[in-house]
Amino acid sequence: MKKTLILLASLLAMWSCNDKDNSGQNDINEPVPGTVVSSETQNFVVDTLATGLKNPWGIEVLPDGRVLVTERSGEILIIANGKLTDEKITVPNVFVHGQGGLMDITVHPDYEKNGWIYLSYSKIGNDGGGTTIARAKLDGNKLSSMEELFSAQPFTDAGAHFGCRIVFDGKGYMFFSSGERGTKENSQNLRNHLGKILRLHDDGRVPTDNPFVNDKKARPEIWSYGHRNPQGVVYDRESNTLWAVEHGPKGGDELNKVEKGKNYGWPVITYGIDYNGTPISDIQQKEGMEQPVRYWVPSIAPCGMAQVKGDKFPNWKDNFLVGALAHTHVARVELKDGKYVKEEKLLDKIGRVRAVEQGPDGLIYVATEGPGMVVRLSPVK
């Protein structure tokens, strides 16, 4: 008990400092085109591709160089030749409610052969809204062949914690995140999809080797559970490792190595406290529950994540670039042998970073809200 009280006192002190640090976060530093930016290990140039956006949520760079950007209101915007075009593609059946709306966008690993684009969004149902995954093909300025593949159950009137990031492993499997919709108990309940990371075939079928596929008391789509609201997910195809960042409450954001069938603890264990300052749990570790590789106190509100690959940014290879909504920067997180080493702020005060993506060209794309824009990072030797 004494150790718990000491830990809580320490955490509260850090949150108090965070309140002071956040006081100047309305001071946004928009990038100056062509200016060389220095980081600890890599210099780069920032180019602004689009401004005046409202609530950009997801980014996908096509093989032909066009950049697709989702607006939470239900539209896909197109950037071509480094400029925002007038083209807007409306996605049907999007329910804009609270934090919900049109969210992530990604292409199939064999996009150049099959043309499939995958979308996540909140959809209206009889009992409220629910996280939904669909796929479609681009046909000019509209979508065609749209197929709804999955909807997280149960639907609810709650407007929070939809999760909604989508990644592929290159073997025909799709992973995507589902938040607990603001109800803590959902995360430990295997009878629903909320507070989970889920795994399906690329056409929506349930893989026969999913961890709970033969458990009648669990949803067969579940890959891992005990999550709060994961809004950054990447799959490292070199090491066959799934990684995710998720929002904690007040403090306790996490970077996790996500493994088959494992429990990531929320809300039984957490390094955060409730927004009103009261404890959520008096323990931070428990047998049978996974520890984060990195956790943040105070919260940075992680949203969007890329893992740097290729030869364009050699000094950042395998580093994670994590969007920080609350702290308005991109966090460069360095690991060694799966353990946290260090972190650096990039693009400090650029705005609420919602999405970070590495394109097939090896360059880094970042979307922000407040102000709403998309920028591109190119290396400088």
PLM features: residue spans?
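Sec-dependent N-terminal signal peptides
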Residues: 4-12
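C-terminal motif of bacterial Sec signal peptides marking the signal peptidase cleavage site
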Residues: 14-16
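Bacterial signal peptide processing site
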Residues: 18-20
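Acidic, Gly/Ser/Thr-rich repeat motifs that build Ca2+-stabilized beta-propeller blades
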Residues: 22-183, 235, 241-248, 298-336, ...
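Surface-exposed loop and turn segments in beta-propeller and other repeat-based domains
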Residues: 88-100, 146-162, 202-224, 266-297
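Short, conserved, GDST-rich strand-edge loop motifs in beta-rich repeat architectures
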Residues: 123, 176-194, 252-254, 258
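Beta-propeller blade signature
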Residues: 131-141, 190-203, 258-259
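Conserved blade-ending motifs and adjacent loop-strand segments that build the rim/top face
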Residues: 227, 339-360
